[in-house]
Swiss-Prot record:
Membrane topology, as annotated: Peripheral membrane protein
InterPro entries registered for this protein in UniProt: ATP_synth_F1_ATPase_gsu, ATP_synth_F1_gsu, ATP_synth_F1_gsu_CS
A GO term from the CC aspect: proton-transporting ATP synthase complex
The organism of origin for this protein: Acidothermus cellulolyticus (strain ATCC 43068 / DSM 8971 / 11B)
Protein name as it appears in the record: ATP synthase gamma chain
NCBIfam families documented for this protein: ATPsyn_F1gamma, PRK05621.1-2
Alphabetized CDD domains for the sequence: F1-ATPase_gamma
UniProt-listed GO biological process terms: proton motive force-driven plasma membrane ATP synthesis
Subunit structure: F-type ATPases have 2 components, CF(1) - the catalytic core - and CF(0) - the membrane proton channel. CF(1) has five subunits: alpha(3), beta(3), gamma(1), delta(1), epsilon(1). CF(0) has three main subunits: a, b and c.
Amino acid sequence: MGAQLRIYRRRIRSVRATAKITRAMELIAASRIVKAQQRVVASTPYAEAITRAVSAVASQSNVDHPLLTERARPVRAAVLLVTSDRGLAGAYSANVLREGEALTEHLRERGLDVVHYIIGRKGLAYYRFRDRPVVRSWLGFSENPSYLQAKDVADALIAAFNTPADDGGVDEIHVVYTKFVSMLTQTPEARRILPLEVEETTEEPVGGMFPQYEFEPNAAGVLDALLPRYVEARIYNALLQGAASELAARRRACKAATDNAEELIRTYTRLANAARQAEITQEISEIVGGADALVATGSE
């Protein structure tokens, strides 16, 4: 019984140490998620506004900008996957990778060759384990991305888009990330960012008149300035959405792990108490048995 009791106590110490770690990670994620959520709220209007601005300029002009023009015979598509650098985030990265696999399959059904760009160690490990090629990866900033890091990603993707497909370039760029809906809800989402899909409408806007635009110096110059900013803003917003979603997922996962650890501690404590009680009972039985034996010996 003594050996069994030692095993239970050792397990209790081990689980309690793990619970301290998961509890600390839960508190860290909870403290960071507020700021991450604020950054998402702050960046989303800009990303949507610059998308509308680019769409308006494109629809009001006759400029065939290379970042807007659909390729006549697309050959290759790039897929950017936004995953996490660390674990203990539940199914956060797995959901993005699953959405990425579905998008890849859809693109291949269209006859396109698909190349992948990865953000986050989890996504990179997934592709390396399966011996799949990755054009480029970025690591170390999934929880706290900056605009400069988003610009670096955007520059690489724009360069690939501006390169002819025969020279290894791409004809389409898609991004797969996790959209932050609320603290409890985050959903994987795939979006095509290049070429930009210009939405034209015949519905009259509020006020009954369509806005008239004048471009200085010209429409092509405006698009040259806006389109790279549009790609950067979209990727930056995807990174921020992913960071907030990762922290929310980590908070939930660590809370569940802490709760499970506490339940396991209670279970092992009951088992240890039962083992200790059985040990004491056995010791008492041995003492009583020994006393009875002495009494019996003395009476003889």
